[in-house]
Amino acid sequence: MTTNGGQIAFKDLLKNHKGKTTVIEVWASWCSDCVKAMPKVKELQANHPEVAFTFISMDKTADKWLAGIEKHELKGAHYMANDQMKGVFGQAIDLDWIPRYIILDKTGKIVLYRAIEKDFDLINETLNKLK
């Protein structure tokens, strides 16, 4: 779901950032590890202004998701998976923990697939290599 209530397929979401290195964060407003990691995400954004950031929420309701975006002042593209962690999207990426970070290079190739909140050094290192 998009922030204006529309629907978008994951492949179309990826097309929006074609030609740019992209960090996808899978998160939820109720996830304490996600909230704790927000300052690190903002630091990544400040250090890598050339990178597109896409946030995919696992929240159960759009109200909580949208409130979480505003509360944490998240900058980037925002989407909500309608079926939470165990749904189609979660199963497709073998989602077992959030936050989850996925990095795509400028061609759309996945270069980092299973990073979590403890992997910010690896995330930063990967982004530096893609400059």
How should each PLM-predicted stretch be described?
Residues 24, 65, 101:
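Hydrophobic, well-ordered secondary-structure elements that form the walls
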Residues 1-22, 39:
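A short beta-strand-turn-helix
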Residues 9-12, 64, 85-89:
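Short acidic active-site motifs
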Residues 26-43:
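Conserved redox-active cysteine motifs that mediate thiol-disulfide chemistry
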Residues 20-22, 26-30, 97:
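Short pre-active-site segment immediately N-terminal to redox-active cysteine/selenocysteine motifs
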